[in-house]
Amino acid sequence: MMVYKVLVIEDNTDCRELFAMMIRHLGFQVIEADDGEIGVQKALTEKPDLIFMDISMPSMSGINATVCLRESAVTKHIPIIICTAWMAEQYREAALKCGAHDVIIKPVSLKELQIVLLRHLPALTMDS
């Protein structure tokens, strides 16, 4: 059985660890990065099946990192889900315009996370 790899790019340690814990609980392998630049490098080398990315990070924003990933043949096809605590529609529009597949509002429940994973990894089925 294939185990999907999910990259979590989040500068807030508590938030990143919570995301990683929930994703592992759902049966996925997790790769973590604590800023956008490191996240882009890990995406290029690890080739994850899906990326969760914070929109606001100090060294490189989620928007800029998404643009970088969309410019690479290695990562342009990987679903990117932007995560934000900001509910304003302008952030959703900016994320989708730069190439993200979806936007989720933090905090995220386990069920919401599962729904997003099912939506963007269509070959996936979960028994929960």
Segments from the language model and where they lie:
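Conserved acidic carboxylate
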Residues: 10
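Short hydrophobic/Thr-rich beta-strand motif most characteristic of the beta2 strand and flanking loop
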Residues: 27-34, 42
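The feature encodes the CheY-like receiver
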Residues: 16, 58-61, 76, 88, ...
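Alpha4 helix (beta4-alpha4-beta5 surface) of REC/receiver domains from two-component response regulators
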Residues: 20, 64, 87-104, 112-115, ...
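Acidic catalytic/metal-coordinating carboxylates
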Residues: 35-38, 61-67
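Charged docking surfaces used in two-component/phosphorelay signaling
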Residues: 17-25
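Active-site beta3 strand of CheY-like receiver
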Residues: 46-52
